[in-house]
């Protein structure tokens, strides 16, 4: 088995791990990179290049990628986001190394944005699929920078269908737009105690 790099490309952060083909040290590296793509897409490009330079040395490394960054508001829509992120990845890594995660599992990187719906925001399924092999009956609660996923697992199976979209998951309560970094204060509270007085919160970005 070759060594693997896992990349979860989010809109605010890129999460990376390196798993080596080593009987003693499997999980070799874990890192969190700040990549505020809505401010500059170059933050993602430079981070991908840094990982390629420092981690992905040699031909025996496979790079597995999942993304949610296509939802960042610097893109016109989700399709454009997937297309541009795939382009950044293609310009950094060789095809031979790349696999991309879809809700139907890892795929070869010879894909286009025509099947972008399988790729877009599929990291929830990757996490749930991994957990289902460890805990047969549970709820997965994954709190990210922007959103929270709540995914039921029963008898080792993910109860959310692979065809689930963000829209259907929002309707079911499996996707909640609350996170630890990008959630505006005004969406959580109407008032806060400030200088010993309850004060109404301004519903503007600068107030957060």
Stretches found by the model and what they are:
Residues 1-11, 17-141, 151-208:
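Nucleotide/phosphate-binding catalytic cleft detector across ATP-hydrolyzing
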Residues 12, 146:
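Conserved Rossmann-like nucleotide-cofactor binding loop
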């Amino acid at each position: 088995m070759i060594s693997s790099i896992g990349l979860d490309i989010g809109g605010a952060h890129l999460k990376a791990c390196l798993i080596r083909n080593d009987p003693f040290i499997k999980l070799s590296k874990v890192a969190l990179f700040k990549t505020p793509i809505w401010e500059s897409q170059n933050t993602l490009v430079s981070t991908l290049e840094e990982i390629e330079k420092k981690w992905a040395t040699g031909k025996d490394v496979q790079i597995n990628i999942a993304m949610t960054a296509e939802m960042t508001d610097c893109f016109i829509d989700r399709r454009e986001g997937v297309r541009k992120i795939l382009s950044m990845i293609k310009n950094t890594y060789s095809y031979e190394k790349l696999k991309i995660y879809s809700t139907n599992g890892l795929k070869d990187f010879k894909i286009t944005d025509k099947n972008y719906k399988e790729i877009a925001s599929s990291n929830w399924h990757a996490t749930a699929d991994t957990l289902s092999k460890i805990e047969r009956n549970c709820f997965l609660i994954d709190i990210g920078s922007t959103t929270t996923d709540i995914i039921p697992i029963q008898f080792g199976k993910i109860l959310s269908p692979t065809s689930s979209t963000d829209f259907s998951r929002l309707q079911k309560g499996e996707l909640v737009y609350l996170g630890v970094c990008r959630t505006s204060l005004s969406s959580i509270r109407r008032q806060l105690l400030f200088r010993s007085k309850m004060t109404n919160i301004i519903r503007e970005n600068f107030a957060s």
